[in-house]
Amino acid sequence: MAVMDLSSPWALTKQDSACFHLRNAEEERMIAVFLTTWLQEPMTFKDVAVEFTQEEWMMLDSAQRSLYRDVMLENYRNLTSVEYQLYRLTVISPLDQEEIRNMKKRIPQAICPDQKIQPKTKESTVQKILWEEPSNAVKMIKLTMHNWSSTLREDWECHKIRKQHKIPGGHWRQMIYAPKKTVPQELFRDYHELEENSKLGSKLIFSQSIFTSKHCQKCYSEIGCLKHNSIINNYVKNSISEKLYESHECDTTLWHFQRNQTVQKEYTYSKHGMHFTHNMFPVPNNLHMAQNACECNKDETLCHQSSLKKQGQTHTEKKHECNQCGKAFKRISNLTLYKKSHMGEKQYECKECGKVFNDSSTLRRHVRTHTGEKPYECNQCGKAFSQKTSLKAHMRTHTGEKPYECNQCGKSFGTSSYLIVHKRIHTGEKLYECSECGKAFNTSSHLKVHKKIHTGENVYECSDCGKVFSGVSSLRMHIRTHTGEKPYECKECRKAFSVSSSLRRHVRIHTGEKPYECIQCGKAFSQSSSLIIHKRIHTERETL
């Protein structure tokens, strides 16, 4: 390696040409020696490093300082080119430190009162890296190089772990992962050069990982979901400002180096106390997916805006809320469709009748009323239906299931619509009123049948007595009064009835069923008419 004797300030000038002519030959010789001895004789960078005191450094001109920096960086390149990529230590030359000192003089003391510039001596080599908080206040982070005393043997163990887990180093160039608590300085390792920084006028070297060989496996398993290698070029060639992000639940700090000092966008996720700035974050592909990825209750990842939205859905089932009525939806697409009902926007129109609908699925169901298509068929009786919900309701006639029960009388129904109509009997509600005679009905179907009396449409007349009916079923029941037909027979006593409702009421005599209960005294009855008569007793007492 190119080791130079720089004991005096003028040594660089005397050895300039010799150093550059003999560099290649010297490097080849040193690499050969290194390959044969590195496993037997552990070596650190301090063995080949050359340091200046502050007084010596001030006596060098700019050309000598540049030469010193080039030689030191070349030594690092030689180390890292052997067999595998060694973990490089941070090098900021005394020239860079002088520029840092000049910049720090322009910083108000109140911002970082504890930061003092220490002269660089042979006993203490202090490294400094600039970073900015959102307030653009420049602070300094001290990294002491003399504490880094790990050997190449330790680095080789760490490299084997990296190779075993197949994690390329390039994937980690954007992130610095560190516990929020104080980290021992000996853990800071594996630094990578970035492009020329315009502020410092030198090459900055940032950490690729902060863990030694014994920490590598844990480090990679914990932050395995952060792999991303497409943004390394997005934040170079500009003033690099560092943003600090914290997850208060998992006690983790994440650093992101973005290329612009100005904060463009901010995203805050209050569930974990995580704060996100800038819209150029990498998107973890396996966020909350893999076993070794960061779980929700110990978030150790930096989320993209879209990932943040997805993560929020794991905490709140229905995140998107309508600002007009407060109704919430799990997906924003459903909310957008629902808002059309407030705006009166209807996009889908039936070509047959001109009726319009909010969504295409409702239109498709409606079109079946015109085409007569019935794709849903009962596998027991073969009856077909145009809608799947109608088939489900029909299947309950075979199974006898009646899941919808009236909480007042206990009567059960196979469909919710029947229960809604039934409840109007208890409330006395009659929403549908005839505009001709004012008569009201509790269902729209009854009103439609009634209107036929006024219009004369499809009027059914009894041939025996001349009485007219609006429905054919009503005519059939009436004809039975003339013929005496009683098709509905009780299986217990063989008594017959002309209508099915009369048979149902009769069967309750045998079963003892009394579904109609008084809510005031608790007395039950087998027929609703008996309950109505009973309620008059309570109303008469109240009036007295």
Curated annotation (Swiss-Prot):
Function: May be involved in transcriptional regulation.
Family: Belongs to the krueppel C2H2-type zinc-finger protein family.
Protein name (record): Zinc finger protein 891
CDD domains in the record: KRAB_A-box
Recorded GO MF terms: DNA-binding transcription factor activity, RNA polymerase II-specific; RNA polymerase II transcription regulatory region sequence-specific DNA binding; zinc ion binding
Main subcellular location: nucleus
Keywords noted in UniProt: DNA-binding, Metal-binding, Nucleus, Repeat, Transcription, Transcription regulation, Zinc, Zinc-finger
Transmembrane segments: none
Domain called KRAB: residue spans: 43-113
The organism's place on the tree of life at top rank: Eukaryota
Gene from which this protein is expressed: ZNF891
Cellular component GO terms held in the UniProt record: nucleus
Taxonomic lineage from the root: Eukaryota, Metazoa, Chordata, Craniata, Vertebrata
Signal peptide (residue range): none
Positions of C2H2-type zinc fingers: 320-342, 348-370, 376-398, 404-426, 432-454, 460-482, 488-510, 516-538
Compartment annotation: Nucleus
